[in-house]
């Protein structure tokens, strides 16, 4: 069966974002390569060679990948989707939601809904939209 993994684009903040996600999600950053370190170094303007060409964060066997934009076109940000993380406990979901929200914008606080033990939405400080969910069938801790 095929797996769907996300690939994000940033405007010069990829390294900081991926290190942040590594800490928040307790993953393992497997690759963080700049354009300057790659065979494509001469294809990129010198001032953009320190940008990230490819980053890969392992999240328990799944991948969150990213790079920095190097196009001369204006960067329009991350739009039109949200990344969804599903947890088995409300406590873990709350920890992640709180850490992701630091410096970001909460769109919907993490709370019980008619479809979930907990659900919340936010945009983190790097502009990435997130949905944090705990399925109703998961045993909410403390209840």
Predicted feature descriptions by range:
Residues 52, 78-80:
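Short, solvent-exposed loop/turn segments at the edges of secondary structure
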Residues 8-61:
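Core segments of cupin and vicinal oxygen chelate
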Residues 2, 30-33, 58, 65-76, ...:
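Vicinal oxygen chelate
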